[in-house]
Amino acid sequence: MEQIRDIYAGEYTNWSEVGGANRVINPVTRLSGSGSQSVMDAFMGERSIARKSPFSIAGGAIGFSFRYYMDGIVGNQAVKMLALNGIYPSAENIQNGSYPIISEFYAIYRADNTNENIPVLIDWILSEEGQTIIEQSGYVRIQ
């Protein structure tokens, strides 16, 4: 994981520096404030993402996004999800916590909210039907 931080911090600029081909690394980022960019910023911690070289457009790209974009929406066979520390981001590895980078989503409500539909919605989300729809949307089921 530190190697990914190093790439985005600009410490590695060629794939040959990390065991790959002699090609410029093109670290792709997302729009500031987007959900996936916010997760990447948190992953980077105190380290800043380096400015791109003008030559990076000709290089081999590395990027990040939520798994549901890759698994459920994009469907581009040329784009590959990579294992981190030998652990592939499968639904099972995300669900059991062995994949090192995850972002959780929450359904929350105020304790003083008396709307009678809230427990019904929560029960449905946790039901087999709700979990199946979550999975079909590219997310990982809770249970």
Where are these regions (language model features)?
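Exported/periplasmic ABC-transporter solute-binding proteins
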Residues: M1-Q143
